[in-house]
Amino acid sequence: MGLPWFRVHTVVLNDPGRLISVHLMHTALVSGWAGSMAFYELAVFDPSDPVLNPMWRQGMFVLPFMTRLGITKSWGGWNISGESISDPGLWSYEGVAATHIVLSGLLFLASIWHWVYWDLELFRDPRTGKPALDLPKIFGIHLFLSGLLCFGFGAFHVTGLFGPGIWVSDPYGITGRVQPVAPAWGAEGFDPFNPGGIASHHIAAGILGILAGLFHLTVRPPFRLYKALRMGNIETVLSSSIAAVFWAAFVVAGTMWYGSAATPIELFGPTRYQWDLGFFQQEIEKRVQASLAGGASLSEAWSSIPEKLAFYDYIGNNPAKGGLFRAGPMNNGDGIAAGWLGHAVFKDKEGRELFVRRMPTFFETFPVLLLDKDGVVKADVPFRRAESKYSVEQVGVTVTFYGGELDGVTFKDPATVKKYARRAQLGEVFEFDRARLKSDGVFRSSPRGWFTFGHLCFALLFFFGHIWHGARTIFRDVFAGIDPDLDEQVEFGAYQKLGDPSTRKQAV
């Protein structure tokens, strides 16, 4: 047939059997990729330290999605909390991965069967004997089945009625675990950070899908609407399907980047806005002040801060710090976190507390500035020592650590003070192991960043695909050069311009 590569889908345009076949093969590839990718990630995943080396620091992509649906156990004898377990069963990382690969194989065989046995009686219109699909009825079937699945997920899986529930955590990503979720039917269900909205929206959307599916199965479209929306053309189905997919891709890119109940920070890492707004810094300060008000010392107050919370308050975990051309997990950048050194408190020689100005998200380098409680610069690390008035040496800055591994330790040596001032720019101070993975010190993005970037790119691509195929199906007659309202018989080949009597070809 000699079709160019971008026209090869033409072969399934009027071939329902092979149209089913290629869709089965596509689903087989998707399912096979998911299972294989899960096995690969499990092979390289280190579950030993869920606090300082969580899955999102290791660049895991499918494991967070499996975990948020309630899978927490592995055949390797561990669970997501780092504990040892026995008898994980089929509802485990490897069990679900294996079922996807088995499903992929079955779909592969089904695809081959439908490719070979493409000319089934089922696909022929009994009135004409030609291949035909009842697209409005197929639409009703798909809508009904997807509505049933949507309702089942919300009513049974998420609520724990028949299933584990989903991953639920607090706003600061400390107490996350899999638990049943009650549907939220009030206005609070529209809060994107309320897990109850996930249950109620799936139940509501599922019921709507079931009813709409039944409607389309029982009611035939009016002929004028059928013609106007090109309901008989398979390319109409393609166009509207692409529209649904690109819209979904745009939505999930937003919920991932800005955060939501469906994208918990324990599984995907923090959002960039939590760094920009000082979200974790403020919570830590609030907890410290509460401890001090309760009679605790500074050391006791900072020691009570969970290491997990302190680790979130570190710029290296900001997904916007990684570049799009820096491949690999976060651990390949700054290294594997080994421990929290503690909270660094800086003071000048007169005993006034100084605060290091934190680095904004979109800076690679930033001047080291130490400010007093009024925001006035009192010390810095100057670029030109000769013109310096506020150097660490001149101001006599010292640093004392509270909490962490260096609890109670004070450094007065200017070189050491400057080292920790530079590191305090990046948030709480942590020690990293850069040798194990040969980490290069250049920040990487988290799976949150990669998911957002990938889905935005595909959404844009699919948006243009929707416009392209929509235009092709709506203006098919125009592109073909045939006017649908043409009354007279057109003799093909009689005119230089199709259907234009003024351009009749002259006999040679």
Curated annotation (Swiss-Prot):
Chief place of localization: plastid
InterPro entries per UniProt: PS_antenna-like (IPR000932), PS_II_antenna-like_sf (IPR036001), PSII_PsbB (IPR017486)
SUPFAM superfamilies the record matches: Photosystem II antenna protein-like (SSF161077)
GO MF annotation list: chlorophyll binding; electron transporter, transferring electrons within the cyclic electron transport pathway of photosynthesis activity
TM annotation in the entry: 21-36, 101-115, 140-156, 203-218, 237-252, 457-472
UniProt membrane topology term: Multi-pass membrane protein
Subcellular location: Plastid, Chloroplast thylakoid membrane
HAMAP family, alphabetized: PSII_PsbB_CP47
Family according to the record: Belongs to the PsbB/PsbC family. PsbB subfamily.
Quaternary state and interactors: PSII is composed of 1 copy each of membrane proteins PsbA, PsbB, PsbC, PsbD, PsbE, PsbF, PsbH, PsbI, PsbJ, PsbK, PsbL, PsbM, PsbT, PsbX, PsbY, PsbZ, Psb30/Ycf12, at least 3 peripheral proteins of the oxygen-evolving complex and a large number of cofactors. It forms dimeric complexes.
Protein name as catalogued: Photosystem II CP47 reaction center protein
Organism, as annotated: Chlorokybus atmophyticus
